[in-house]
Curated annotation (Swiss-Prot):
It comes from Solanum lycopersicum. CDD domains: Cu-Zn_Superoxide_Dismutase. Homodimer. Cu cation binds at residues 45, 47, 62, 119. This is Superoxide dismutase [Cu-Zn] 1.
Amino acid sequence: MVKAVAVLNSSEGVSGTYLFTQVGVAPTTVNGNISGLKPGLHGFHVHALGDTTNGCMSTGPHYNPAGKEHGAPEDEVRHAGDLGNITVGEDGTASFTITDKQIPLTGPQSIIGRAVVVHADPDDLGKGGHELSKSTGNAGGRIACGIIGLQG
């Protein structure tokens, strides 16, 4: 079993922890808790770079080793890092579990060392018709991020 963690922070008071687990070649499970967000849906993605020298802006685009258009987690055509939305309650917190086969913790397409980013707005899953729908899901600004690192 391989485990990883990302601790998310922002200058706007958002904080959270995402735990990643993968057994063998099975899909990766992500268990997340985050607080300090406005209620509603927020896009969240794995971004290509684990670089936070300029905050979340330096994490690069969505992780997309296959060069596909943006889509929903269940779509065949999607970035590997397209993880959809998290639902934030009225208290500003969210807890969630997802399982995804395109975010491995081992091998040549491992997400270790990359960043996870939470966005200000909902991800339209590539179906919104906006000029940014097919690249970012029109999910708005990057409000919190953390680097995915191996956990002992």
